[in-house]
Amino acid sequence: MANNEQKRDEGYIEKLVQVNRVAKTVKGGRIFTFTALTVVGDGKGRVGFGRGKSREVPAAIQKAMEAARRNMIQVDLNGTTLQYATKAAHGASKIYMQPASEGTGVIAGGAMRAILEVAGVHNVLAKCYGSTNPVNVVHATFKGLKAMQSPESIAAKRGKSVEEIS
């Protein structure tokens, strides 16, 4: 599993999470294609993931990066950590993330670490249960981050102050 990182001129941090070779068997033999899973973020709460498929690895990575830039979400962060502890699942992958105090660092494995780093989360405790398939872990992590809302946004939706809802 590769974990390459690149900073682009648009200010996005790009990470390659996984490259997978798949084979289609035909009458004349096997046809190999590659799939790439990438995550892109600005380090300030915007993050996206994408998958790309092609006959060559660089083309698959390029398609995945473009898909990730199109599929970006805004995550409400509390400084350099999460707002509150959250759970999410996708397929057989289950994830748990909780905020951590300053200086803790990103304690997460594999695909979750890549997403949290490009999103700009510097202090978090995270655990993946069940299947550790990177594609499902990325989906589950995104579900958890997408569902997270700051107290300010909840208060604004309800037309109340933050003190009234806490």
Swiss-Prot record:
UniProt cross-references to PROSITE patterns, sorted A to Z: RIBOSOMAL_S5, S5_DSRBD
InterPro entries: Ribosomal_Su5_D2-typ_SF, Ribosomal_uS5, Ribosomal_uS5_bac-type, Ribosomal_uS5_C, Ribosomal_uS5_N, Ribosomal_uS5_N_CS, Ribsml_uS5_D2-typ_fold_subgr
Residues covered by the S5 DRBM domain: 12-75
CC annotations in GO: small ribosomal subunit
Domain of life: Bacteria
Keywords: Ribonucleoprotein, Ribosomal protein, RNA-binding, rRNA-binding
Coiled coil location: none
GO annotation, biological process: translation
Molecular function via GO: rRNA binding; structural constituent of ribosome
Domain-level remarks: The N-terminal domain interacts with the head of the 30S subunit; the C-terminal domain interacts with the body and contacts protein S4. The interaction surface between S4 and S5 is involved in control of translational fidelity.
Functional description taken from the UniProt entry: With S4 and S12 plays an important role in translational accuracy. Located at the back of the 30S subunit body where it stabilizes the conformation of the head with respect to the body.
Family the entry assigns: Belongs to the universal ribosomal protein uS5 family.
Subunit note: Part of the 30S ribosomal subunit. Contacts proteins S4 and S8.
This protein's name: Small ribosomal subunit protein uS5
Organism placement in taxonomy: Bacteria, Pseudomonadati, Pseudomonadota, Gammaproteobacteria, Pseudomonadales
